[in-house]
Amino acid sequence: MPHSSLHPSIPCPRGHGAQKAALVLLSACLVTLWGLGEPPEHTLRYLVLHLASLQLGLLLNGVCSLAEELRHIHSRYRGSYWRTVRACLGCPLRRGALLLLSIYFYYSLPNAVGPPFTWMLALLGLSQALNILLGLKGLAPAEISAVCEKGNFNVAHGLAWSYYIGYLRLILPELQARIRTYNQHYNNLLRGAVSQRLYILLPLDCGVPDNLSMADPNIRFLDKLPQQTGDHAGIKDRVYSNSIYELLENGQRAGTCVLEYATPLQTLFAMSQYSQAGFSREDRLEQAKLFCRTLEDILADAPESQNNCRLIAYQEPADDSSFSLSQEVLRHLRQEEKEEVTVGSLKTSAVPSTSTMSQEPELLISGMEKPLPLRTDFS
């Protein structure tokens, strides 16, 4: 199954499975209609009638929605009736053209025995009214999720962009300089490429304690990087601080890195605790996964995040107490160290040997007393 590179449980964006299934359904229906042996005119007439009823049903549903939206025309649509109509009916010209075209074909085809068009129109209006009053026209949860993802309407989308714009975009460009300054004063404690990055923890259950040592005693606070300050949103000399942690293994230091949680996950957890937010545990898990995927996509295209930031997404097993956050972080650090060594060896092997290229050119002189002419075919 397709999933994000961060974690197997993080889904990839939806593809075109629904469209492919619709093509299969279309083929099956065409074969069924062909096998029934009905006259083509008869089949076409009922098909056009059905399409016309669908368009008319959508139109009637939009008219009912328009009655409510007109009450908010100034607050939601800046007093524009055209915007209000488009919000409820889509493009009125397109929908009206489809409706008129369907009605034209309905009356132009040979008539068959059936209920009058006026009776069918009244029945269609009745069914749409019942759908609205009884709440039968709601979308399925999967459809709502697909619409929100496609339109970037999710809570996770806004949180991920807020986290990047309001925090990561500001601190990542200066991170390497702050680490170099720290190393100058503390004997290169953060040496190596993997130690000179910001590692962001992404627990999918949104469990974000304020103290990392509470999550794992083998993660121990060591020091802080030099603070970064700046004026933002009217706040003078706003301070940005990052913490350095040492990772213990068998009681010994096994790694050192700049480590922290993604604070928006704490917001998601808090939202699920407030009934006013209408945010269930399942919603929290879905939004946490979408937050991780969106943040990964943002950082993949952000030049300031190149080699400056790494995401560590994980999910603690509910029935397994052997999970160790420090070991999870160490696993990522060691994996990156291996990748750094592999990339370095490939670059070294790609450079041609300089043992012969760097030598001084030598002038080779023949031992003959007289130089030979340019032509050697003389007799």
From Swiss-Prot:
Quote the function comment for this protein. Facilitator of innate immune signaling that acts as a sensor of cytosolic DNA from bacteria and viruses and promotes the production of type I interferon (IFN-alpha and IFN-beta). Innate immune response is triggered in response to non-CpG double-stranded DNA from viruses and bacteria delivered to the cytoplasm. Acts by binding cyclic dinucleotides: recognizes and binds cyclic di-GMP (c-di-GMP), a second messenger produced by bacteria, cyclic UMP-AMP (2',3'-cUAMP), and cyclic GMP-AMP (cGAMP), a messenger produced by CGAS in response to DNA virus in the cytosol. (Microbial infection) Antiviral activity is antagonized by oncoproteins, such as papillomavirus (HPV) protein E7 and adenovirus early E1A protein. Such oncoproteins prevent the ability to sense cytosolic DNA.
Q: Which gene encodes it?
A: STING1
Please give the name of this protein. Stimulator of interferon genes protein
Q: Which organism is it from?
A: Homo sapiens (Human)
Tell me how this protein assembles: Homodimer; forms a homodimer in absence of cyclic nucleotide (c-di-GMP or cGAMP); 'Lys-63'-linked ubiquitination at Lys-150 is required for homodimerization. Homotetramer; in presence of cyclic nucleotide (c-di-GMP or cGAMP), forms tetramers and higher-order oligomers through side-by-side packing. Interacts (when phosphorylated) with IRF3; following activation and phosphorylation on the pLxIS motif by TBK1, recruits IRF3. Interacts with RIGI, MAVS and SSR2. Interacts with RNF5 and TRIM56. Interacts with TBK1; when homodimer, leading to subsequent production of IFN-beta. (Microbial infection) Interacts with human papillomavirus (HPV) protein E7.
Spans annotated as Mediates interaction with ZDHHC1 and ZDHHC11: 1-190
Give the Phosphothreonine positions (modified residues): 229, 354, 356
One GO BP: antiviral innate immune response
Give the result of residue 68 to A, as annotated: Abolished ability to induce the production of type I interferon
Impact of mutating residue 158 to E? Abolished homodimerization and activation
Q: Which family does it belong to?
A: Belongs to the STING family.
**Tissue-specificity statement:** Ubiquitously expressed. Expressed in skin endothelial cells, alveolar type 2 pneumocytes, bronchial epithelium and alveolar macrophages.
Provide the alphabetized UniProt keywords: Autophagy, Cell membrane, Cytoplasm, Cytoplasmic vesicle, Disease variant, Endoplasmic reticulum, Golgi apparatus, Host-virus interaction, Immunity, Innate immunity, Ion channel, Ion transport, Isopeptide bond, Lipoprotein, Membrane, Mitochondrion, Mitochondrion outer membrane, Nucleotide-binding, Palmitate, Phosphoprotein, Transmembrane, Transmembrane helix, Transport, Ubl conjugation
Q: Which InterPro entries match?
A: STING, STING_C_chordates, STING_C_sf, STING_LBD, STING_TM
Please describe, based on the UniProt annotation, the reported consequence of changing residue 284 to S.
Answer: Found in a 9-month-old patient who died following a fever and severe neck abscess without indication of any severe bacterial infection; likely pathogenic; may affect splicing; constitutively active mutant that promotes the production of type I interferon in absence of cyclic dinucleotide ligand; localizes to the perinuclear region in absence of cyclic dinucleotide ligand
Q: What is the effect of changing residue 166 to S?
A: Slight decrease in c-di-GMP-binding
Q: Which residue intervals are topologically Cytoplasmic?
A: 1-17, 70-91, 135-379
* Topology in the lipid bilayer: Multi-pass membrane protein
Per the record, what is the consequence of mutating residue 20 to R?
Answer: Does not affect amount of ubiquitination
Record Pfam families:
STING_LBD (PF15009), STING_TM (PF23417)
Q: Provide the catalytic activity annotation.
A: H(+)(in) = H(+)(out)
